[in-house]
Amino acid sequence: MIYRNWSLLSSTVVIWGGVATAGLAGIFLFGGKEKFQNYLCREGERLRQQDRAAMGKN
């Protein structure tokens, strides 16, 4: 086996890329997309409320 200086870095990138791909596939294949979108909407609204409260204090 040939060892290169970048082999550890590239293998880490490949592993994380595979994890991200599997996660996205799970979201799209198993209907998690709607739940995820609902979560993002709720989280966005919560952050907007926090921003409004912080701006009101100034």
Curated annotation (Swiss-Prot):
Annotated GO CC locations: mitochondrial inner membrane; respiratory chain complex II (succinate dehydrogenase)
Species name: Oryza sativa subsp. japonica (Rice)
Keyword Repressor listed: no
Primary location group: mitochondrion
Complex formation: Component of complex II composed of eight subunits in plants: four classical SDH subunits SDH1, SDH2, SDH3 and SDH4 (a flavoprotein (FP), an iron-sulfur protein (IP), and a cytochrome b composed of a large and a small subunit.), as well as four subunits unknown in mitochondria from bacteria and heterotrophic eukaryotes.
Places the protein is found: Mitochondrion inner membrane
Pathway: Carbohydrate metabolism; tricarboxylic acid cycle
Assigned keywords, A-Z: Membrane, Mitochondrion, Mitochondrion inner membrane, Tricarboxylic acid cycle
GO BP term, pick one: tricarboxylic acid cycle
Protein name: Succinate dehydrogenase subunit 8A, mitochondrial
Membrane topology according to the record: Peripheral membrane protein
